[in-house]
Regions:
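Structured secondary-structure scaffolds
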Residues: 1-128
Length: 128
C-alpha cells in the first residue's frame, strides 16, 4: 500500500501550502499540510484571542504537545486550548472515500504518528 512513497515528492515550488522553513522557495507537499487540520478545529473558537505575532511553533507545541511555554499568550488561555484539544482528541472515527486510502488517509496516519503521542493517534478509519 505504501510502496510508492519513495517516489512521492515531499516539496514543490508552487501552489498553496506551508513554506519550507529553511528554504522559502519550496512548499511542503500539500498532503502533509492537510491531514491534521482537525486538531486546529479543536481550538479555532479560541485562537482569535491570541495576537497573531504570538502564534508560532512554541505556541502550537504548548497547545498540542504540552511542551514548553508560549511567550506572550496568557497561560490560562493556553491551558484552556490544551484542554479543548485533549477533550476532542484523538479522533474516534474518520470516514473517507476508498480512493483516498493510498494517499490522503495514509498521510493522515503518518502525520498523526509523527507529530502526536500514541494517545492522540486516530482510533478508527472507515472507507466507503
Amino acid at each position: 500500500m505504501i510502496d510508492w512513497l519513495h517516489e512521492w515528492a515531499c516539496v514543490r515550488e508552487n501552489g498553496l501550502g506551508t513554506r519550507l522553513p529553511w528554504d522559502e522557495r519550496w512548499l511542503i507537499e500539500s498532503l502533509s499540510d492537510s491531514t491534521i487540520y482537525m486538531a486546529y478545529y479543536t481550538i479555532v473558537h479560541l485562537i482569535k484571542e491570541v495576537p497573531v505575532e504570538f502564534i508560532d511553533d512554541s505556541f502550537f507545541d504548548a497547545v498540542f504537545l504540552g511542551k514548553g511555554h508560549s511567550s506572550g499568550v496568557d497561560d490560562k488561555l493556553v491551558e484552556k486550548m490544551k484542554n479543548e484539544f485533549d477533550y476532542w482528541y484523538p479522533v474516534d472515527f474518520r470516514n473517507s472515500g476508498k480512493d483516498l486510502v493510498q494517499n490522503h488517509l495514509t498521510f493522515y496516519i503518518f502525520n498523526h504518528v509523527a507529530i502526536f503521542g500514541e494517545d492522540k493517534w486516530p482510533k478508527g478509519i472507515g472507507v466507503n
